[in-house]
Structure formats: structure tokens, C-alpha cells
Amino acid sequence: MAEAYIIDACRTPRGVGKVGKGALAHLHPQHLGATVLAALRDRNDLNTADVDDIIWGTSTQKDKQGGDLGRMAALDAGYDTKASGVTLDRFCGSGITTVSLAAAQIMSGMEDVVIAGGTEMMSYTAQIADPKKPFMMDAGNLSLRAKHPQTQQGCSADAIATIEGIDRAAADQLYLRSTPYSISSWSSRLTIRGQPMAT
């Protein structure tokens, strides 16, 4: 089985996800993705015709953040038209899913060069874009809701911790154990390099 390697990683700056308030909120989501894809191409002297696929993730795949965001961002970045793209929506797990799928494609031998990433502009999420319409993972499907009631991540995390017997002290201990790793990562520059945005 082939090995899969992460060669580089890049991200845009974070900002407030409110139009009129956030520094990046007025930008098109495809432009955010294109900025990252262009940086990866330039930093690695990448011939984009060699890219087999671009697997992109998003949450709330609608409006300007809808469609095949990965493919459109690649075209906006000037990638060769041979570089295909696919976009998936697995809510907050979209980014890690794209990396897993990219590795699987490479390890299976189906593809050689895959770029994985994602874009989420909070100004497009239902709760922020239209506060009168609360976000529902079941999209208003009452039959599904009756069979499988769903809740948000914070409530789910609290319920799981309660069921598994993880109390606040244990959560705090995990935080204290993981913080030195985070500090070490920052100081040794193992963190993802950010890409400035032209606003």
C-alpha cells in the first residue's frame, strides 16, 4: 500500500463572521479558498496539471458557499482545468474528512497528488445569515426528528461527558496536559502557516 504524506498546510486569517463587522466577511468564499490554493501552488512550485483532485469541505453548503466550492476555488486560483474538485458538507467535521479521504485516495493507488481543505464563512450559516430561522440539522424533517432527535455540539458534548462519567476536573486535566504541546508547536513553528488576504 502506498504511503500518504502531508507536504504543506496553509490557512487564511480568522475573522468575525458578520457582514459589516468582520474583516473578511465581504469576501467571496471561493476567493478565500483560491488564496490558500495559490499559496500552496507557489510555495511548492506545484504544476497544477499534476493535481489529481481537490477535496474541499464546508459547512452550510449554500448560497456563495454552495456548489463545488473546491473546484471553483481552484479555477479562481488559476489551477489547470485538469485538476478536478469535489466538495462535501459534514458540518464541523468537513475539514478532517477531506484530509482522510485524500489520504485514502493516495494510499489506495487511485491518485497521486491530492489537495484537501475547506472553507467556512460563518456569515452564511443559518443562525447568523437569518437569525429568525434557527439552524436544524434535520432541515425541518419532522419524521426524521421523531426517529432521531438531534442537538448542537455543545449540548452533545455535555451529554457524552455525563454518560461517560467525565467530570469538569478531568476535562481541565486534559486541557493542562495538552497546553504544553500547543505552546511547543507554536514555538517550534510546527503550526500551519497563515496566508495574508488581499481584501
Per-region residue spans from a language model:
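Active-site-proximal alpha-helical scaffold in enzymes
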Residues: 88-120, 161-182
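Conserved "HGTGT" condensation-loop signature of ketosynthase/thiolase-family condensing enzymes
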Residues: 1-83, 121-199
